[in-house]
Amino acid sequence: MEQYNVKLHRRAVQDLDGIYTYIAQTLMEAETALKLIDRLEDAIFSLETLPYRCPERRTGSYACRGYRQLLIENYTIIFQIDEARRQVLVVTVRYSSRA
């Protein structure tokens, strides 16, 4: 089974940083923040194999434009697949109420 190269758009990196900062500094739960970021990163890099297992995005931002989504806890990871380059580009990671 061929693998895909997973890349994070600058926005996705900023989203992950923001999630960590909010939980660690605002909620004062640094350990919880680290564990959540680990789970989100594990999910993101699981897209190296079988990224088509995730459904196309049908509602909200990025809907019906070829983007796919992966739901992890209360977060939505939104990404595109570039088949020619065998690449998955994660464009954003959003709290589900905003996704």
Which residue ranges define each predicted feature?
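Basic, Lys/Arg-enriched alpha-helical interface segments
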Residues: 1-66
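Enriched for short, Lys/Arg-rich terminal
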Residues: 27, 68-99
